[in-house]
Amino acid sequence: LKCHNKLVPFLSKTCPEGKNLCYKMTLMKMPKIPIKRGCTDACPKSSLLVKVVCCNKDKCN
C-alpha cells in the first residue's frame, strides 16, 4: 500500500508491514486543507476540531 505522507499530494511512501490504511486529517473548519497524512494500522478517531478520513487503496488519502 502506498499512502501520501506529506501535505503536498504528489509525495507518497510505501507503508510498513501491518500498516494497511492511509489516513488524512483535516480541520473541521477548513476541510479542504490537510494537516497530516500517512499510514496507520487503525483509523484514528475524529474529534471536535479534527476530521479523520481513512481508506485502503493506494494514494487514496
Curated annotation (Swiss-Prot):
InterPro entries: Cytotoxin_Cobra, Snake_3FTx, Snake_toxin-like_sf, Snake_toxin_con_site, Toxin_cobra-type. It is found in: Secreted. Disulfide bonds join 3-22, 15-39, 43-54, 55-60. PROSITE patterns: SNAKE_TOXIN (PS00272). Keywords: Cardiotoxin, Cytolysis, Disulfide bond, Hemolysis, Hypotensive agent, Secreted, Toxin. Expressed by the venom gland. GO terms for cellular component: extracellular region. GO terms for biological process: killing of cells of another organism; regulation of blood pressure. GO terms for molecular function: toxin activity. It comes from the Eukaryota. Pfam families: Toxin_cobra-type. CDD domains: TFP_snake_toxin. Gene3D superfamilies: CD59. This protein lyses red blood cells and has cardiotoxic and hypotensive activities. Is classified as a P-type cytotoxin, since a proline residue stands at position 31 (Pro-31 in standard classification). Belongs to the three-finger toxin family. Short-chain subfamily. Type IB cytotoxin sub-subfamily. This is Three-finger hemachatoxin.
